[in-house]
Regions:
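Single conserved hydrophobic/aromatic residue that forms the stacking wall/gate
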Residues: 110-116
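Phosphate- and other anionic-substrate recognition elements at nucleic-acid/protein interfaces
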Residues: 1-109
């Protein structure tokens, strides 16, 4: 099974693709979609959406794993991340990917225990 893992954001969206077979994870690809703070926010959302669509098309994952949104003290930041997360989920849904949501703590533990 090929899994695309996403750490959502609107400035930087981290992503990694792993192949899972026979109780083993193998890294396939990784990167980030970065947006420029100097452009309008709606343009940044478009860049996130387009970037994630390109990653999905290029890496052909079977499922998407994404961090759940958690409350931050800065409401402006949490709203922006929620909006970016929305366009990421849209790209995944349009590609027909099942979506699995995890807490940041669990996904960090999973990623670090299988990192190479």
């Amino acid at each position: 099974m090929r899994v695309l893992g996403i750490d959502p954001g609107y400035a930087i969206v981290g992503w990694g693709v792993v192949e899972y077979a026979g109780n083993r994870f193998a890294p396939v690809d990784f990167g980030a979609v970065c947006t420029d703070a100097g452009v309008p926010f709606e343009r940044r959302l478009d860049e996130v959406y387009t970037g994630i669509k390109e990653v999905i098309e290029r890496t052909q994952p079977e499922v998407l794993a994404i961090e759940k949104l958690f409350y931050q003290h800065n409401q402006t930041t949490v709203i922006g991340v929620a909006e970016a997360r929305g366009v990421i989920l849209l790209a995944a849904a349009q590609a027909g990917l099942p979506i699995y949501e995890y807490t940041d703590r669990k996904s960090t533990r999973l990623n670090s225990s299988h990192a190479t």
